[in-house]
A protein has these predicted regions:
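Non-transmembrane "mature" sequence context
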Residues: 1-128
């Protein structure tokens, strides 16, 4: 992993705790689309994430943490490779995640475990 990759990962982590949930939701929706964002967040439809992107309330810390993790992963991959690769990364089967897609891990695992696992998968992507 190059220095610039480490910088991108560090920026993603810092921004995930500094940027508001509204801005995180807007960034993710703009980067990968509301359908993929909603699926990665474990939401039933796009209305909820679109509401968050426009300042709507997020009910519960689990949703906030899931959004934070999705933002961190999306930011890192998008900044390094662009939005199309970020979307493909979230959708695609990943050997670092037991051949599960990162969006599935983010939606179904505890937010802390999902964040750790998907960031490790991003690091593997950057190292290749």
């Amino acid at each position: 992993m190059s220095v610039s990759d480490e910088v991108v990962l560090e920026q993603a982590q810092k921004l995930s705790v500094q940027v508001s949930s509204e801005e995180q939701a807007r960034y993710v929706v703009d980067a990968v689309g509301s359908r993929l964002a909603a699926a990665a967040l474990g939401l039933r439809d796009t209305r909820t994430v679109n509401s968050w992107a426009h300042g709507g309330p997020i009910k519960g810390p689990l949703h906030e943490h899931r959004l934070q993790a999705l933002f961190r992963v999306t930011y890192a991959v998008k900044e390094r490779y662009g939005p199309a690769v970020a979307a493909a990364f979230l959708r695609g089967s990943n050997p670092a995640l037991g051949n599960r897609a990162p969006m599935t891990v983010l939606a179904n695992e505890s937010p802390a475990d999902a964040e750790q696992a998907t960031i490790a998968a991003v690091e593997t992507l950057f190292a290749s």
